[in-house]
């Protein structure tokens, strides 16, 4: 029987989507295995160790701990401060999102990098900077006798400092791609400026605002370093309480219960976040972001720009400037020179070695995060992914919300026997850092991959190209910039990871955040000066990496960050 060429092509075209679906499912094997071994297994090991004693389960500890008044108070404060921090961050950052989306002004790329620096700094550095600003003997204390340390206001301000970039990049990135002509058309039909914004722009932005708010709530709900340093013994979040129960009281059963409570809360937050992300990816009329920014016109727009710049200067730049000033307090760059020797006996090596260690660890973590995150993003490319893949997408975000203290301690407990006896291996630190980097890689690459015209892939497959060749010759050229940006962001985040690394970094191989924390934990002006110097170096490295990302990004919106 003769078969026409057209029938062959139709058969190939029908087989291509089925083959693509099988390949996408196959791509999930590596990410699933990675998260199962290096995330689910260590966290489960901590929970099991805490709730299983002498071979018997102590389920009653769940109710004993959860019903305690102290835990209820911690849970209430954790939720309350997260909600207040989220509301305050949105109030302060949404005008900034508009300015970065719609205004063109000199130094915009540099300023965008500057506002992102706090997001990737370790909390111990930020806590130290705010102590120098609002604590005893700080700038505000010297000038006006005002102290905010050990108050909830210091915690809230530091959370806004951290999460300002989340709102600016998530909401501003979409805002820059909305067609301003739609709002202008509404005004031509007689709508006021506010009515046009409320009926046209706000509905389009609502999913992005909701997604940003949920991410800010997640980050502040799991806050650790900021609350521990600025809140003192008065305030405690679930994360701080887990750390206290684990490392100070050695009550693993209480820590396990608190971890489960946090896990349940984070799971609910991420489920809602996944739904808002899908809504955000609905049909919108998007345009090139580079064509929507204009020079401010009129007194109102110039005043708005000035107000945003003033806010950035006071809230974001001033704490960083105080950090630099404290590092230069010793004449002749004395604090920086002291990094070459460990006169205080804090380390087995000079503190300056932490710079090289951090760069090496971050490079390895970036490679792992890009590989795992890239495979995961490719597997999630289809918009009409089934429930299994949608669940997988949500689970990829879990490392951002589950206690880093639990993960780090879980590594030490779970990965201690063959075939995964890694306790003495240097790879533990990059693995822990990569867990935090993978979600950012996915969130940056996924929207770009979904924007690739599926017909290009299908045409290449019909012509006989293998899935690997389709990805190499169709997807890769189109997503190369997003891939580089994802790698850079993973690198910056890995540099600042502290919660898990503090458990895993060996004394002879400290990272910059761990070195800063150890120096701050020792008395003396020399140790404090070295801590400020290392913090400044870390800040400058992160700023340089983010500035390169902004150069790569140009005027285009790339993913969610």
Identify the residue ranges that each predicted region occupies.
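Transmembrane-helix boundary motif in ABC transporter permease subunits
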Residues: 84-115, 128, 182, 196-201, ...
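Membrane-interfacial helix termini and adjacent extracytoplasmic/periplasmic loops
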Residues: 11-17, 59-60, 64, 72, ...
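Short membrane-interfacial helix/loop motifs at transmembrane-helix boundaries
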Residues: 25, 33-72, 79-82, 87, ...
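Interhelical loop and adjacent transmembrane-helix boundary motif
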Residues: 18-24, 64-70, 221-267, 271, ...
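C-terminal transmembrane helix and the adjacent membrane-cytosol boundary/short C-terminal tail
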Residues: 2-12, 22, 27, 107-108, ...
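Amphipathic cytosolic juxtamembrane alpha-helices at the membrane-cytosol interface
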Residues: 17-19, 76, 106-110, 153-154, ...
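N-terminal signal-anchor/first transmembrane alpha helix
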Residues: 2-45, 109-115, 262-263, 267-271, ...
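Transmembrane alpha-helices
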Residues: 30-34, 87, 117, 121, ...
């Amino acid at each position: 029987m003769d078969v026409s060429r057209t029938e062959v092509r139709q058969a190939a075209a029908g087989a291509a989507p089925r083959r693509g679906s099988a390949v996408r499912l196959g791509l999930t094997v590596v990410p699933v295995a990675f998260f199962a071994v290096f995330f689910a297994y260590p966290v489960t090991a901590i929970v099991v160790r805490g709730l299983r004693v002498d071979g018997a389960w102590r389920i009653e500890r769940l109710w004993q701990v959860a019903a305690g008044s102290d835990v209820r108070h911690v849970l209430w404060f954790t939720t309350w401060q997260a909600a207040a921090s989220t509301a305050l961050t949105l109030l302060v950052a949404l005008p900034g999102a508009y300015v970065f989306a719609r205004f063109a002004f000199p130094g915009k790329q540099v300023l965008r990098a500057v506002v992102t620096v706090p997001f990737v700094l370790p909390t111990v550095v930020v806590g130290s900077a705010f102590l120098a600003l609002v604590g005893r003997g700080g700038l505000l204390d010297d000038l006006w006798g005002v102290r905010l340390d050990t108050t909830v206001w210091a915690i809230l301000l530091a959370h806004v400092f951290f999460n300002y970039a989340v709102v600016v990049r998530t909401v501003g990135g979409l805002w820059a791609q909305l067609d301003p002509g739609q709002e202008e058309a509404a005004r031509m039909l007689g709508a006021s400026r506010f009515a046009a914004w409320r009926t046209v722009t706000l509905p389009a932005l609502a999913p992005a605002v909701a997604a940003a708010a949920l991410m800010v709530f997640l980050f502040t709900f799991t806050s650790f370093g900021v609350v521990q340093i600025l809140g003192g013994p008065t305030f405690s979040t679930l994360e701080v309480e887990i750390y206290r129960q684990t490392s100070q009281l050695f009550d693993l059963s209480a820590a396990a219960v608190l971890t489960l409570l946090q896990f349940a809360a984070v799971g609910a937050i991420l489920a809602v976040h996944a739904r808002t992300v899908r809504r955000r990816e609905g049909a919108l009329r998007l345009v090139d972001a580079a064509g929507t920014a204009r020079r401010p016109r009129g007194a109102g727009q110039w005043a708005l720009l000035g107000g945003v710049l003033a806010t950035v200067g006071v809230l974001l730049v001033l704490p960083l400037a105080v950090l630099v000033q404290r590092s230069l307090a010793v004449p002749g760059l004395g604090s920086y020179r002291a990094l070459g020797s460990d006169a205080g006996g804090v380390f087995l090596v000079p503190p300056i070695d932490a710079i090289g260690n951090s760069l090496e660890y971050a490079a390895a973590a970036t490679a792992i995060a890009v590989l795992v995150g890239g495979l995961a993003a490719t597997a999630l490319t289809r918009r009409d992914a089934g429930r299994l893949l949608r669940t997988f997408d949500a689970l990829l975000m879990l490392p951002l919300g589950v206690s880093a203290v639990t993960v780090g301690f879980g590594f030490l407990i779970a990965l201690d026997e063959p075939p995964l006896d890694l306790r003495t291996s240097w790879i533990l630190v990059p693995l822990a850092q990569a867990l935090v980097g993978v979600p950012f890689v996915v969130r940056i690459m996924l929207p770009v991959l979904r924007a690739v015209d599926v017909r290009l892939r299908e045409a290449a497959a019909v012509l006989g190209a293998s899935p690997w060749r389709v990805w190499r010759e169709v997807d890769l050229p189109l997503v190369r910039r997003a891939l580089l940006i994802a790698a850079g962001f993973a690198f910056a985040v890995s540099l600042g990871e502290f919660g898990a690394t503090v458990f895993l970094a060996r004394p002879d191989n400290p990272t910059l955040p761990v070195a800063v924390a150890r120096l701050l934990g020792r008395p003396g002006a020399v140790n404090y000066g070295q801590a400020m110097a290392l913090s400044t170096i870390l800040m400058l490295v992160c700023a340089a990496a983010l500035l390169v990302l902004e150069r790569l990004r140009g005027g285009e919106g790339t993913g969610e960050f």
